[in-house]
A protein has these predicted regions:
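Glycine-rich FAD pyrophosphate-binding loop
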Residues: 50-70
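N-terminal Rossmann-like FAD-binding beta1-loop-alpha1 element of flavoenzymes
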Residues: 30-57
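Extreme N-terminal leader/targeting segments of oxidoreductases
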Residues: 1-32
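C-terminal catalytic lobe of FAD-dependent flavoproteins
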Residues: 307-309, 314-430
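Active-site substrate-recognition segment that forms the wall
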Residues: 107, 115-123, 209-211, 227-267, ...
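Dinucleotide-binding Rossmann-like beta1-alpha1 core, especially the glycine-rich loop
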Residues: 78-160
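Helix-loop-beta segment of a Rossmann-like dinucleotide-binding subdomain
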Residues: 92, 119-129, 161-195, 199, ...
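Helical element adjacent to the flavin cofactor pocket in flavoenzyme catalytic cores
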Residues: 138, 145, 172-231
């Protein structure tokens, strides 16, 4: 039986009932073995099972026990690495094809929710990304140009349009994406798992993959109490992959971020946030939030490489909310929880075949809900003989993220990013002051 319950969260409190899946005991055979029961592993297993492949998935804890069951729930195109940087590095054509692959991921998620007949999993449509600094007169032109270059459908909103929806002086212009939406991620993961089983796939919880050996033209994946012999193995364990593949596990950096859900707020919330879509800001370590359950605020934010839970997490999150919406000063936090994202140093996912029959689908950072589906689609196509989608990701290797030393270095980088957010805002406040006097 699977170990433990889900960690306490609003998602766990509102989740669907799901069976405990048995541990893998003894040796079994499959076409494909998947390590990790988060969205990367679940989408991969489902897409392959849809193609008639015999799939076995092993998960150390429970389905979507990691980031996939605890995140902000935003589904949208793009990647954790900024599009402008991708264009500089790869050129326009390649960046456009990468963006298109992320749009494929969005569609896979949308179509799966439709196919499951679960409209309640889809909790709202559209997204606003608001700037905390004035972006100047050319913001609209720059935004439209970037959208055109990428083949994207996002569009600029002025400061007045933004503040009409979000009653805070913190925000200036924003980017409106009509193609994004937001979901109940844990229930979506549980629905994916049920669908894999309907398609004949086998899921094992409480089962850690511990070692991997070549056996002729197949792989032997050893687990805590058993083993799988398979032609292909897909490693989708993100930042907690562990000893099953030491090099790949070191190539993904664990970065913590936090989510809180308030108690029910009443009409004050609707007065402050007149928008049922998702919201985030443009900072490197920004806030992301949405209204759930009618009048609760689900608020995510902060990043750190310290993966332990801070003792005063609820107060920290409440302070973050009130700093943007001072009119909500009386709110109370009902749930707060941490989650671990997996980042590669280049901030792009690691997707592809690293040895014959050994695949990776990992390192989705803070942009994983659609991108895991995009990655799974690329890996599935690769396993079935078309490597072109996986090749899109080949410039982003599985370089070393550095273990404890790399983590300290990454923490310094994050502090620098947060400092530059702070300087941007300070400069903005000084400019505003100058205009007033
Ligand atoms: C708090 C938070 C908020 C976020 N908000 C958003 C958001 O709003 N939108 C968005 O797009 N992204 C968001 N993200 C990122 C997104 O959740 C992740 O990118 C995505 O869920 C990653 O999926 P995954 O399957 O790669 O990893 P995970 O969900 O972490 O799954 C990996 C699984 O593999 C298992 N595993 C690892 N190693 C082994 C092993 N050796 N044997 C067996 N099992 C193993 C783990 O137990 C785990 O369950 C957020 C992340 C967090 C933490």
């Amino acid at each position: 039986m699977a170990e433990g319950a889900y960690p306490a969260s609003w998602y766990a409190a509102t989740r669907d009932a799901a069976p405990d899946r048995p541990q893998l005991a003894g040796q079994t055979e499959a076409d494909i073995a998947v390590v990790g029961g988060g969205f990367a592993g679940l989408h991969t297993a489902r897409l392959l099972a849809q193609q008639g492949q015999r799939v076995v998935l092993v998960e150390r804890h429970r389905i979507a026990w990691g980031a996939s069951g605890r995140n902000g729930g935003f589904v949208g195109p793009g990647y954790a690495a900024r599009s402008g940087l991708l264009i500089d590095k790869l050129g326009l054509d390649h960046s456009r094809r990468l963006y298109a692959q992320s749009q494929v991921g969005v569609e896979i998620v949308r179509q799966a929710i439709e196919a499951f007949g679960r409209p309640d999993i889809l909790m709202g449509s559209r997204k606003l990304v608001a700037s905390r600094t004035d972006q100047g007169a050319d913001f609209a032109d720059r935004t439209r140009r970037l959208a055109e270059q990428l083949g994207a459908r996002f569009e600029p909103w002025s400061t007045a349009e933004t503040r009409e929806k979000l009653d805070t002086a913190r925000y200036f212009q924003s980017i409106h994406d009509p193609t994004s939406f937001h979901i109940h991620p844990l229930n979506f993961a549980l629905a994916l798992a049920a669908d894999i089983e309907r398609l004949g796939g086998r899921l094992h919880e409480g089962t850690e993959a511990t070692a991997l050996d070549r056996k002729g033209d197949r792989w032997l994946l050893r687990t805590s109490q058993g083993a799988v012999i398979a032609r292909h193995v897909v490693l989708a364990g993100s930042a907690t992959l562990g000893q099953v593949h030491g090099r790949l596990s070191r190539a993904v950096l664990p970065v913590a971020t936090y989510v809180a859900v308030t108690e029910k707020i009443g009409p004050d919330l609707g007065a402050a946030i007149r928008w049922s879509g998702a919201i985030s800001d443009t900072r490197r370590a920004g806030d992301y939030y949405r209204v759930v359950d009618g009048d609760r605020l689900l608020w995510g934010g902060r990043i750190t490489t310290d993966t332990s839970e801070p003792p005063r997490l609820r107060e920290m999150m409440r302070g973050d909310i009130v700093s943007v919406y001072p009119q909500l000063r009386d709110i109370r936090i009902a749930y707060a929880w941490p989650g671990i994202m997996g980042y590669a140093p280049h901030k792009m996912p690691q997707i592809g075949e690293i040895e014959p029959g050994l695949w990776i689908c990992s390192a989705f950072g803070g942009h994983g809900l659609a991108q895991t589906a995009a990655g799974a689609d690329a890996v599935t196509a690769g396993i079935l003989g078309d490597p072109s989608k996986a090749r899109l990701f080949s410039p982003f290797g599985t370089d070393w993220a550095g273990g404890p030393i790399g983590r300290a270095a990454a923490q310094l980088v994050y502090w620098q990013l947060q400092a530059s957010d702070w300087w941007d805002e300070k400069r903005e406040a000084r400019n505003a002051e100058r205009l007033r006097t």
